[in-house]
Amino acid sequence: MRLSRYFLPILKENPKEAEIVSHRLMLRSGMIRQQSAGIYSWLPIGLKVLNKVCDIIREEQNRAGANEILMPTIQSADLWRESGRYDAYGKEMLRIQDRQERDMLFGPTNEEMVTDIFRSYVRSYKDLPLNLYHIQWKFRDEVRPRFGVMRSREFLMKDAYSFDLDYEGAKMAYYRMFVSYLRTFARVGLQAIPMRADTGPIGGDLSHEFIILAETGESQVFCDKAYLDLAVPGADTDFRNDAQLTDIVNRWTTPYAATDEMHDEADWSKVKPEDQVSARGIEVGHIFHFGTKYSEPMGAKVQGPDGKEHLVSMGSYGIGPSRLVAAAIEAFHDDAGIIWPKAIAPFGAGIVNMKPGDEGCDAVSEKIYEALTNAGVDPLLDDTDDRPGAKFATMDLIGLPTQVIVGPRGVAAGEVEIKDRKTGERQSLSVEAAINLLTAEA
């Protein structure tokens, strides 16, 4: 993409309404625009990042055996009355009526609808286990939306829902999602720590929040330093191997980890002082087993191997892709702007033509741009007439992993400069060496 043709509305000043780093940088870098309280438009560069996050989530859900569907944003109130949640949910639910005066709602979540889909088609235990997921916009009418897309009223969510014959089956479905989430966050470039969460009236221990450590985190968290060195399950993980999954979950739940709500001083005191990590954290995912909470009132049953009908045991598994984008910025930024992990960077590299109109600079910039494009690197070429200082500031702000600086002096010497956005390190290379370096990992 050429910057001269790209819609990138950069803000030079920090927006007054932005309270946290991610909100400020997302507005300044032209990723989002606020349309009303807690509601945002995603602009081209922001949407590219959001789509990359969704692609990774989708790949890992599919790898774990989940099936993608797409449920509507507008739901019938009748389904929610079946579960008993329509009147109990509160003012966060946006209730509406159609022209026939039928009660509808803008879905804040999808347990009722996915249970209705399941009960309409599945009759036998032979069709289990089953996991259905979708990535869809949600709306919750927060009293005080704040922090940009971190806590907005409209947000994108990946919801997965598992259906199993019994608790043992549901536990393995939970383990599959647990391991899938570890891989998902690692691929995005984040180190997420699973922390035991409240299970409410359901009880048991199958509820975890996935937390990333960040100075601007919304909650206090406590964990054993051992988590920082745990190896994330590899691409060769067999999601059909219950023993392997159980071993992974055990390794990732044995050391101490808790949010302030679940913190236990007695257990915490058993962790060596030098291994105690007390920090701020951001929740980026939540998985939860809720048994027959929805299958019972909605009659979601299957015939078991004993010939009798059984209520299915269910779980839900959520990741907010829009929130995850903001969380990544909170984790990876400096005073100059965003520092994107390579996997979700909007462009693979930025090419800075220091002097558009100069025959040599134009030729070298075009050569690199064409080579990177053909190799699938997806570069952004700054071919604008902005001053060099403004060009560098823009590249640092939008956080592309690598910058290729093409200037008259370097071109005369047959070289370009490569800058690593994360480390700030610079190196001068021949044009061919620069192309080889940037295309080696494509």
Swiss-Prot record:
It is found in: Cytoplasm. It catalyses: tRNA(Pro) + L-proline + ATP = L-prolyl-tRNA(Pro) + AMP + diphosphate. It comes from the Bacteria. Pfam families: HGTP_anticodon, tRNA-synt_2b. GO terms for cellular component: cytosol. The keyword Oxidoreductase does not apply. It is an enzyme of class 6 (ligase). Gene3D superfamilies: Anticodon-binding domain, Bira Bifunctional Protein, Domain 2. GO terms for biological process: prolyl-tRNA aminoacylation. Its EC number is 6.1.1.15. GO terms for molecular function: ATP binding; proline-tRNA ligase activity. Transmembrane segments: none annotated. Keywords: Aminoacyl-tRNA synthetase, ATP-binding, Cytoplasm, Ligase, Nucleotide-binding, Protein biosynthesis. InterPro entries: aa-tRNA-synt_IIb, aa-tRNA-synth_II, aa-tRNA-synth_II/BPL/LPL, Anticodon-bd, Anticodon-bd_dom_sf, Pro-tRNA-ligase_IIa, Pro-tRNA-synth_IIa_bac-type, Pro-tRNA_synthetase. SUPFAM superfamilies: Class II aaRS ABD-related, Class II aaRS and biotin synthetases. The keyword Transcription regulation does not apply. NCBIfam families: PRK12325.1 (NF008979), proS_fam_II (TIGR00409). Belongs to the class-II aminoacyl-tRNA synthetase family. ProS type 2 subfamily. Homodimer. Catalyzes the attachment of proline to tRNA(Pro) in a two-step reaction: proline is first activated by ATP to form Pro-AMP and then transferred to the acceptor end of tRNA(Pro). This is Proline--tRNA ligase. It comes from Brucella anthropi (strain ATCC 49188 / DSM 6882 / CCUG 24695 / JCM 21032 / LMG 3331 / NBRC 15819 / NCTC 12168 / Alc 37).
